[in-house]
Amino acid sequence: MSCSATDLAVLLGPNATAAANYICGQLGDVNNKFIDTAFAIDNTYLLFSAYLVFSMQLGFAMLCAGSVRAKNTMNIMLTNVLDAAAGGLFYYLFGYAFAFGSPSNGFIGKHYFGLKDIPTASADYSNFLYQWAFAIAAAGITSGSIAERTQFVAYLIYSSFLTGFVYPVVSHWFWSVDGWASPFRTDGDLLFSTGAIDFAGSGVVHMVGGIAGLWGALIEGPRLGRFDNGGRAIALRGHSASLVVLGTFLLWFGWYGFNPGSFNKILVTYETGTYNGQWSAVGRTAVTTTLAGCTAALTTLFGKRLLSGHWNVTDVCNGLLGGFAAITGGCSVVEPWAAIICGFVAALVLLGCNKLAEKLKYDDPLEAAQLHGGCGAWGLIFTALFAQEKYLNQIYGNKPGRPHGLFMGGGGKLLGAQLIQIIVITGWVSATMGTLFFILKKMKLLRISSEDEMAGMDMTRHGGFAYMYFDDDESHKAIQLRRVEPRSPSPSGANTTPTPV
């Protein structure tokens, strides 16, 4: 909204100048209020999205708790709390600066340590909160891969290092205005004329967390009893499918802040006089997210039925999350029909990675490396195949002839950028987190003792079980709860009566 006192003066006649100045002043005030209101709405939208993403920590905690054995429940839930707490402090001190401290070089940020000089025109407290929620999500992914056998001090060290340095550097590369591969670069020097497209973090979040977990689990080795002497896999099932389902639905809910919230703003008009604005893109992103997850869940359901003969709810939950991890990178730049393809292939990737992990005797209690690493990598490739040019221009700035999806007629440049992203993330996380886990192992700070692992860390490290196996009130013996395990069969095999222990 604009106003010219000179133009108004001609129309108003005598004493026109004062009247024109007054009218323009009032219109200017109204215009400023509109700007302030738009900023407040966008800021509220980002804060609400941050709250949704943070709620995913509860989902991670429940998912992890249900996926491990009961004797390690307190341990895994404590590590999830630790991820958020340690991540909050180290992301405040270092992480946000390394990620978004502009102006900086293409490798790492160098401003805003401890949020110094914030707020600015490009960085605000709400943006820090939102990005912190992403950082601790990456750390939460890693904790699942090394569950049930890792020392508590190792969790503290790796979580702080990941959220304070490793993850922020990757997010700087692909999400900041200075990153060498970022599509947001202000100097126009884009990788393959497009930059690597990873809208909400299939690579930046999921691959980082998954590959870090991969190295942790590889260096630690499998849990005791996971494979027999002949190398055959033995299922060490989690103790609560109910918690797995609860955690999955909480993560699903939080993903609506994870993906649509990554727009950061909602009051952006694309075409004047139409309904086509960022508010519509936000809705489309929520739809693509939903369709990818639902398709992956159903594909996993029937795929596992064919492979194992069972309808397994925990496998379906993992398939659902694999679809979400895959669509995260391209959720805003593809059509809803393409999201169905994304989810279908993500389920196949997850099933294939799980088969490969079993053959290689790789043990990941939550399938985190397969789910987040494998499906995240597929999500980046999927974006290179199906990204729409008009959506890329709306989000990343209008650039005529911008490279887009290969299958959409956009050539292979975007695919090249996405493959480079996969390679550099794999290399960076392997070099940093792999080295860290190796050092921790050499210092005997990584894996717990065999005795602790057999007994369970809840009892040996955390002072007791997460659940009451019996009622401490001796006057109510009749309502004691007991674990029931089968007796070893007699030579004749006749005695199959369960024995309380």
From Swiss-Prot:
A Pfam family recorded for this sequence: Ammonium_transp
Disruption outcome: No effect on ammonium uptake. Higher expression of AMT1-2; AMT1-3 and AMT2-1.
PROSITE patterns assigned: AMMONIUM_TRANSP
Chain positions with Phosphoserine modification: S475, S488, S490, S492
Topological relation to the membrane, as annotated: Multi-pass membrane protein
GO cellular component, one term: plasmodesma
Keywords linked to the UniProt accession: Ammonia transport, Cell membrane, Membrane, Phosphoprotein, Transmembrane, Transmembrane helix, Transport
Induction of synthesis: By nitrogen deprivation in roots and nitrogen supply in leaves.
Main location: membrane
Localization (cell): Cell membrane
TM ranges: 8-28, 46-66, 81-101, 128-148, 152-172, 199-219, 243-263, 333-353, 366-386, 419-439
GO MF term list: ammonium channel activity
GO biological process, any: protein polymerization
InterPro entries, sorted: Ammonium/urea_transptr (IPR029020), Ammonium_transpt (IPR001905), Ammonium_transpt_CS (IPR018047), NH4_transpt_AmtB-like_dom (IPR024041)
Domain of life: Eukaryota
Tissue expression as described in the entry: Highly expressed in roots. Expressed in root tips, root hairs, root epidermis, rhizodermis, cortex and pericycle. Expressed in leaves epidermal and mesophyll cells.
NCBIfam families per UniProt: amt
PANTHER family according to UniProt: AMMONIUM TRANSPORTER, AMMONIUM TRANSPORTER 1 MEMBER 1
Primary role: High affinity ammonium transporter probably involved in ammonium uptake from the soil, long-distance transport to the shoots and re-uptake of apoplastic ammonium that derives from photorespiration in shoots. Contributes with AMT1-3 to the overall ammonium uptake capacity in roots under nitrogen-deficiency conditions.
Family: Belongs to the ammonia transporter channel (TC 1.A.11.2) family.
Subunit structure: Self interacts. Interacts with the receptor protein kinases CEPR2, At2g28990 and PAM74.
Name of the featured protein: Ammonium transporter 1 member 1
UniProt source species: Arabidopsis thaliana
Organismal lineage: Eukaryota, Viridiplantae, Streptophyta, Embryophyta, Tracheophyta
